[in-house]
Amino acid sequence: MWSLRLHPSPFGAACQGIFTSTSLLFLVTVPLVCTIVYDSCLYMDVNASRALANVYDLPDDFFPQIDDLVRDAKDALEPYWKAETIKKHVLIATHFVDLIEDFWQTTQGMSQIADALRAVIPPTTVPVPEGFLITHSEAEEIPLNDLFSNQEERIVNFQPDYPITARIHTHLRVYTKLNEQALDKARRLLWWHYNCLLWGEATVTNYISRLRTWLSTPEKYRGKDAPTIEAITRPIQVAQGGRNQTKGTRKPRGLEPRRRKVKTTVVYGRRRSKSRGRRSSPSQRAGSPLPRNRGNQTRSPSPRE
């Protein structure tokens, strides 16, 4: 895609580099602007914002390479594209797939141009220190049209007579680094959204929380292997499968209130429920003699009388 033909004179290479850097300046900063707008406008949910903040804190080597990431995202999005589904995760993931594909190639081309310009830079030229280069956080505060002039002013402050080829190389270095950082942020967002389509947003949030806990735990106190999202979803899948297989053969527990057991006592060889029968008087308890008729009863004389 990228073919660079260097001119034999430093002036020709400088002209070619100036044209390349100025023409690509707008394209370079588009991913940066898109990610800033995304964070401030497109995602206002509190729980999702916390989960995304956790995604930003994960190590860089946790995420797949850009080529593998885009391929996996397309595989996850293909059923939704065919069904023309309009969902939040589908729309945003599709946006980042297109953005990463386009500007990853642009970033690679700029890196190749910067490497080719090294051949025409005077060997005695000292590279511009990091303190004179625009950082990612500073680029968010600088207007887009002032980005080139701001970096040029910093180069002049470092060395007023800095060679023009070295200046172009410095500009390309800065823009490539800014683009790579913006693409890394977009890569993490793409990973989040297409995994939410595969596993569900709640499951991915739970997985990220467990993974961060595992990473923050000292090595001697944590498990040998990091948690996986498959292990989190496996118990749910097994439970659902078990219910489908045993349906109709066993009554599930906990769906109906249990009946209270009725206490019974033995009365003359038969069982009598206390809850169903009325409470008998003290003189008619089980096992007591029948009461005598007091009307016909004559009182025995007292021995004192």
UniProtKB/Swiss-Prot annotation:
Record keyword Lipid biosynthesis present: no
Biased composition, class Polar residues, residue ranges: 294-305
Signal peptide span: 1-19
Record GO terms (molecular function): structural molecule activity
Source taxon at top rank: Viruses
A GO cellular-component term linked to this record: extracellular region
Pfam families found in the cross-reference section: Hepatitis_core
Residues that span the membrane, as ranges: none
Propiece span(s): 273-305
Entries under InterPro entries matching the protein: Hepatitis_core, Viral_capsid_core_dom_sf_HBV
Chief location: secreted
Biased composition (Basic residues): 248-279
UniProt-annotated location(s): Secreted
Keywords associated with the record: Host-virus interaction, Secreted, Signal, Viral immunoevasion
Record-annotated site: Cleavage: R272, S273
Quaternary context: Homodimerizes.
Family per similarity comment: Belongs to the avihepadnavirus precore antigen family.
Function: May regulate immune response to the intracellular capsid in acting as a T-cell tolerogen, by having an immunoregulatory effect which prevents destruction of infected cells by cytotoxic T-cells.
Record's protein name: External core antigen
Lineage of the organism: Viruses, Riboviria, Pararnavirae, Artverviricota, Revtraviricetes
